[in-house]
Structures are given as structure tokens and as C-alpha cells.
């Protein structure tokens, strides 16, 4: 085997994950991303920065840009979920989650923020949102995400945006399950512009704190004439403050709003499934027991250390080891798991 062919080396305290640079390949059409993922994981949580700003060097679908992240871009519009790495066509990158401050603004071009303090390592990503003073962090299990937002004092919000994403497919629905839980489905597909290759992705979301307020939004069609005169949300986003059961459409979303204290941390976790919402909840409850972001992060790091350290090398420089272990890291992202914890597997072809 390759492991046997290489010389085993390294000190007991050295970690091979220290040599992984998740930012390698995130520029010049390298098509990778620095998001949090476990080896061969179905879930990945990636900073989404390819829409909404004239400052972006590359935008979604610009010159075949096919990933949710570009290293040169600095306009964060949320974490996207279930992302592809190393592919040449845009797909997935679904269900954006975004913390903000102040009045709820559902338009990603307005609520998006520049960011600083970016850092990534296997199984973990973080940055600071300049517009809000919010620190965002993400990690993952095989089928679920764990996200932590550290807020300043004021009105803090968590937005769940179903309208935007990397996929060229549109449409979905959301349902309020409880004050702290929502579920839904987002259509995906048309990979490499195959218009009939479509499929649903189901999700289950839980937040760690009950909001003071919450609700759906939906972008309304542009009307003309008399209808336009009596429609206050004509061509804009309608905020549903009294209706709160379920909603469907293309440009839809949900918000949780809080009165946050300085430094208050609120967590969000998401389970996904390509079979059903029931399976998404089952995946979430099986892989995360309550809210324990740091424990999930530690487990993700340990899974990468275990898989990558199957091959230990000596000789060469630290830069050589970075090249080797970063390439091995990327090789262990795909192919990825698609079955749920109960063993059910999606039908990937059209019915």
C-alpha cells in the first residue's frame, strides 16, 4: 500500500492536520472551498461570498465560476450547506444561514457584509462580519452542521434564506415546527446545465434559543395598474408577521430575532437528507445530542486527524507536507456519503 511504501515519521505531538491549508484551490478557478466538512461527509458548511456585491472579483456563474466561495471576494451573505468541491459546474450550495443586527432585511445585497479575521482548518471555519460586529463559526458532522454566532448587544437576527444559492434550480418550501425549529425542502439540480436532472434536498433546523420574534418572508411579483396601488409589498419582500405555518415559492425565507447581550452566543444546527424531512431530523438527532459546538468541532478535527494520519511522511520541507496533506484532504471530500443514518438512500433519477 501507499502507507507502507512511505516512511513513517513525525513526533507524537505533531498533528498532520496542521499541514492542511483549506484555502488552497479557492482562487484562479481551483473550485475548492474552505468550508467545514468531515471526511466524505454529506454536510459541508461554506462561507457564501459569490453574490451581491460589485466588489466581488468573481460572482456565481461568472466565467464558469462554480463554487460558493472565492478567496478574493469579501462579501459574506451567509453559510451555504451541502457544497461540492473540485467540480466544474455550479450546483448545491443551499439554504443560506446569516446572522445580522437591527431591522430584518431579507435582501442579500443589503444584509450581506464584508468580513475580516478569516480562518479555516479541517472541520472548522470562522470570520468576523464587519457590518455587524458578529463572529461566525461553523463545524460539521457527517450529515449535520453546527454554527455559532457571537453577537454584540442589540437586536440580533438569524436569517434562513431559501431563495439564494449556488444551484441554478429554484423553488422550495418551509414549515415552522416550533419556536426554535423549522423544516423544509429546497430544489436543486440542473448540474452542468442539464435542465431535467433535478432533485429535492430536505433540511431540519434548530436554534439554541427561543426568539423574541420570528416569521417568514417572500418576494412578491411586480404588479401594474390598480393592483400595484393597493399592494404595499409590490415587487418587494413581504414580511409575514401574523401568518406562521408554512410557505412555498422561489424567494422565501425565515428569520429569528433576539434581544442579544454583548458577547451572547446563539447556536444553529441543521440536518439534511435527500429522502425526507423526517430523515433530516433523524440525522440531526442521531449525530448531535443537544447544543455542543466545541465538542462537534473537536470530533470533526479528530476525524480528519485519524484519516489523514494513515499516511505519515518524513523528509522534505513543511511546505512539501502542506502540499501533500492538503491534496490528501481534498481527495477525502468526495465521493461523499448520501445515505441517512437509517440506511435509506435517495433516488437520484427523476420519477
Residue ranges and their predicted role:
Residues 1-9:
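Bacterial N-terminal signal peptides
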Amino acid at each position: 500500500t501507499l502507507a507502507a511504501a512511505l516512511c513513517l515519521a513525525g513526533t507524537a505531538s505533531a498533528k498532520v492536520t496542521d499541514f492542511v491549508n483549506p484555502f488552497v484551490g479557492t482562487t484562479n478557478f481551483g473550485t475548492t472551498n474552505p468550508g467545514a466538512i468531515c471526511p466524505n461527509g454529506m454536510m459541508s458548511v461554506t462561507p457564501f461570498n459569490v453574490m451581491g456585491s460589485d466588489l466581488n472579483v468573481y460572482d456565481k456563474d461568472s466565467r464558469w465560476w462554480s463554487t460558493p466561495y472565492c478567496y478574493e471576494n469579501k462579501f459574506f451573505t451567509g453559510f451555504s450547506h451541502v457544497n461540492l468541491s473540485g467540480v466544474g459546474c455550479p450546483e448545491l450550495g443551499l439554504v443560506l444561514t446569516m446572522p445580522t443586527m437591527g431591522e430584518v432585511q431579507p435582501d442579500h445585497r443589503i444584509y450581506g457584509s464584508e468580513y475580516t479575521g478569516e480562518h479555516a482548518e479541517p472541520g472548522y471555519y470562522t470570520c468576523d462580519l464587519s457590518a455587524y460586529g458578529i463572529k461566525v463559526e461553523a463545524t460539521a458532522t457527517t450529515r449535520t452542521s453546527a454554527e455559532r454566532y457571537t453577537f454584540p448587544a442589540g437586536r440580533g437576527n438569524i436569517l434562513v434564506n431559501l431563495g439564494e444559492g449556488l444551484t441554478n434550480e429554484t423553488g422550495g418550501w418551509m414549515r415552522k415546527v416550533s419556536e426554535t425549529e423549522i423544516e423544509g425542502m429546497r430544489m436543486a439540480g440542473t448540474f452542468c446545465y442539464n435542465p431535467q436532472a433535478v432533485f429535492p434536498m430536505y433540511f431540519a433546523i434548530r436554534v439554541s434559543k427561543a426568539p423574541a420574534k420570528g416569521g417568514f418572508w417572500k418576494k412578491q411579483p411586480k404588479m401594474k395598474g390598480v393592483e400595484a396601488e393597493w399592494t404595499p409589498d409590490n415587487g418587494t419582500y413581504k414580511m409575514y408577521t401574523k401568518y406562521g405555518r408554512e410557505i412555498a415559492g422561489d424567494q422565501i425565507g425565515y428569520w429569528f430575532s433576539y434581544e442579544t447581550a454583548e458577547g451572547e452566543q446563539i447556536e444553529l444546527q441543521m440536518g439534511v437528507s435527500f429522502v425526507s424531512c423526517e430523515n433530516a431530523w433523524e440525522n440531526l438527532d442521531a449525530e448531535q445530542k443537544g447544543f455542543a459546538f466545541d465538542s462537534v468541532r473537536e470530533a470533526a478535527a479528530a476525524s480528519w486527524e485519524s484519516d489523514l494520519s494513515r499516511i505519515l511522511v518524513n523528509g522534505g520541507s513543511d511546505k512539501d507536507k502542506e502540499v501533500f496533506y492538503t491534496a490528501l484532504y481534498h481527495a477525502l471530500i468526495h465521493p461523499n456519503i448520501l445515505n441517512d443514518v437509517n440506511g435509506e438512500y435517495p433516488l437520484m433519477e427523476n420519477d
